[in-house]
């Protein structure tokens, strides 16, 4: 099970640059995401996300407003061939999207507890 935290800054072109760490790491690593959908609303869209942990990783990233929220809480989903790898929630502080993320295994565990 993986539990982590992240932040993303958005470039003028709509791409994302940031850092993350999780329970299996002792340091922060970089992550970038190239926007592949039309850039209309800050942070909202579909991206191709890339980072290095032990090896290079690349997944699709979908960011949208969390359902039943005030459009100030964001829902993030990283997928590989439509299989969910990581889920996250975050919010904006000083134009930076910050939040927590977890893998699908931890998400199922949490859902079974409540």
What are these language model-derived features?
Residues 1-114:
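Central antiparallel beta-sheet cores of small beta-barrel/beta-sandwich binding domains
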């Amino acid at each position: 099970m993986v539990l982590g935290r992240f932040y993303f800054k958005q470039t003028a072109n709509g791409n994302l640059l940031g850092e993350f760490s999780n329970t299996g790491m002792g340091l922060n690593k970089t992550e970038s995401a190239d926007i592949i959908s039309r850039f209309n609303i800050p942070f909202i869209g579909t991206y191709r996300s890339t980072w290095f942990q032990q090896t290079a990783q690349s997944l699709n990233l979908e960011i949208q407003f969390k359902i039943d929220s005030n459009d100030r809480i964001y829902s993030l989903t990283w997928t590989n061939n439509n299989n969910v790898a990581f889920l996250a929630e975050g919010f904006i502080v000083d134009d930076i999207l910050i939040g927590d993320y977890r893998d699908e295994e931890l998400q199922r565990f949490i859902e079974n507890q409540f």
